[in-house]
Design a protein with these regions (language model features):
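Conserved active-site segments centered on acidic
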Residues: 1-51
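Short, charged/polar "capping" segments at the starts of alpha-helices
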Residues: 22-25, 65-69
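Conserved acidic residues
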Residues: 56
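Phosphate-binding/catalytic loops
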Residues: 67-143
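Redox-cofactor binding/interface segments in oxidoreductases and associated redox assembly factors
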Residues: 60-61
Length: 143
């Protein structure tokens, strides 16, 4: 949500949720601050915190969610082939379910602190690229 709200702030408002509320990893806060994004809320919200809200899109970002586009076996937007599939699933929040696959969860990275921080940078940059591309394709980023 921080990336979307930073780079597409005039056109999109995003909220972020995790399966359970948890502290935000300090390495994520650090790599976001490298590109000018200040993280002020240091806890993720749980999905249940949004139970009464509706959204245009519910987006799952990380590749280990197990969802892929039609070309790769499911019905969703695919970050691997960068295309919107024709049958987006509806969610309980009223929005279309969209998956970006192929982005590894940096919180599961192993190695030195520098290697893990680099995994966060890579995920940050990949997520930014696919979100900007996605919102352009759904006409939210056209002047």
């Amino acid at each position: 949500a921080w990336l979307t709200n930073h780079f597409l702030r005039d056109r999109v408002h995003a909220s972020a949720a995790a399966a359970d509320a948890a502290p935000v990893d300090p390495r994520l806060i650090a790599v976001l601050s490298e590109i000018g994004i200040a993280v002020t809320d240091c806890m993720t919200k749980a999905e249940e915190d949004f139970a009464e809200e509706t959204f245009d899109y519910v987006i799952t970002l990380l590749g280990d969610a197990g969802e892929k586009c039609l070309l790769h076996g499911a019905t969703s937007y695919c970050g691997r082939c960068n295309a919107v599939c024709p049958h987006l699933q509806q969610t309980s929040h009223g929005g279309k379910r969209v998956y970006f696959t192929g982005i590894l969860d940096p919180s599961r990275s192993l190695g030195s602190d520098d290697e893990i921080r680099e995994a966060y940078r890579k995920a940050r940059d990949e997520i930014k690229d696919v979100l900007v591309r996605f919102f352009r394709e759904v006409s939210l980023d056209k002047p």
